Amino acid sequence: MDIERTLDAWLNDAEFAENVAFHQLKPARQAMFEPFPATIHPTLQKVLREKGITALYSHQAEAINRLYSGENVVISTGTSSGKSLCYSIPILNQQFLQPGATALLLFPTKALTNDQHKSFSEYAKALPVETIKPAIYDGDTPSHQRSAIRKSATILMTNPDMLHQGILPHHTNWARFFSKLRYVVIDETHIYRGVFGSHFANVVRRLKRICAFYGAYPQFIMTSATIGNPAELAQSLIEQGVHLIDQDGSPKGPAHLLVFNPPFVDEKLGIRKSSLDFGVTFTLKLIRAGHQSLVFARTRRTVEMLLTYLRNRLSNEERDLARGYRSGYLKTERREIEQGLKSGRLRAVFSTSALELG
């Protein structure tokens, strides 16, 4: 059953509909395409076409053109709008223009890091350029691999904590990398707010100072969710001018936004049913209707509670369709769950903010 039919059935159910506090249908949007900019090397264009990318969305083309005019950019477009191509194409293209040039990519979660490492690794195999060497350098990186990464990686994926504690204090071991640094990518810029954002801005300040010591002045490519002040935030983080790209050229299907109140247990006293129990009921309905669900919870404990409640209501054959996702899981477990979501094998995942970004 498609989601429209499922929603119609629910909204025509009086018991269900009376708990709908808000319902909005966001209309579909057509894609706006642009041809590949002439600055992209023909070989890279060929590989992109082989991967099914025959043109760029308008915001992707604008980002690439702005970068090649020497500007820093922040891309603030919707989820699944292809923001990663805004930085992966310039980074890959730079290896044709300046073999051995380096790029530093900062991701807030390991899930995002692994996704992009897989993507860059696929390009490295497809492109006839030996200097495309992507690597992850974080807490999961085995110690015996770290020296080789410092010596040869050209596309380094890490997180702010590792940059602060494991890379910048030992910058002399990274002299090759910093001296050739061309691009710095800051993904999910919108999370760097408040005290955390102030700390991160100081890390960026240190990064820029070390780059200058080695004679490098990289451009910054930042991505952000659609917040109110992405350009202002980006400028405060890097203390440089930034061009905002917020006209989303990607297509978007219609989306339903619904806000529910759990039903009353005692209307006179204003006591409602537990939101956790209501959330599990929702998730169960979606699974039985053939849909996939991602449910976010505030704490790790709540994630495990929701998973337990749901599995208690599923049949033995259905229990493996639901999983939790939070910090504390083994790396192999996290990768398995991420793959299960992508493939559609998992029908429901309860997660903390560990899976929220990107």
Task: Indicate residue ranges for each PLM-predicted region.
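Helicase-associated low-complexity/disordered flanking segments
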Residues: M1-A61, S69-N72, I132, R319
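Conserved Walker A/P-loop ATP-binding site and its immediately adjacent core
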Residues: S84-L85, A101-E122, A225-P230, R300-R301
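Conserved SF1/SF2 helicase motif Ia
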Residues: L92-D115, V129, A212-A216
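Conserved strand-helix element at the start of the C-terminal RecA-like helicase core
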Residues: T102-L105, T109-T113, T283-R313
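Conserved helix-turn-beta segment of the N-terminal RecA-like "Helicase ATP-binding" lobe
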Residues: L112-I136, S236-V242, L314
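Conserved helix/coil segment N-terminal to the catalytic DExD/H
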Residues: G139-R182, G340
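Conserved helicase ATPase core of P-loop NTP-dependent helicases/translocases
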Residues: Q145, Y329-T352
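Conserved interdomain linker/interface between the two RecA-like ATPase lobes of SF2 helicase motors
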Residues: Q219-T223, I227, A231-V303
